[in-house]
Amino acid sequence: MVTIEDVRAIVAGLDRAYEAVVRDRVKFRVGRIVFLAFSRDERMMGFAFPKDERAALVASEPDKFLLPKPGDMRYQWVVVRLDAVDLQELRELVEEAWAMVVPKRLSAAYFATVNPDGSGNPDGSGARDAPGAPPTR
């Protein structure tokens, strides 16, 4: 199972990202924008995700992904159960959430560095269409 420590290690390599504790919950931000937030027990992680694609994501893997609580439905947000993802998928979720809140040039430069062939995927699969695109499932 992945943990918050795995997320911290991933976030450490992302420009402008930092950790904050708000109301006893760990959150990761760029500026004032939250792109990751943990439940108090750190077993679930909310992450930035395109609002118009989240229903399909949750429907595709309902044991892994959840819609946000009703009060947060207005945000571009999805929740993942950490015990249901591996480290590679966690990395993709974290990187893509971060890419949603930073300037496109910054995310493009990061993904070009992660995979110099320009695909944006560390595995070189080329499945990533463009910087800031949601993770391929």
Regions found by a protein language model. Give the residues of each.
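Charge-dense, helix-prone N-terminal extensions
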Residues: 1-137
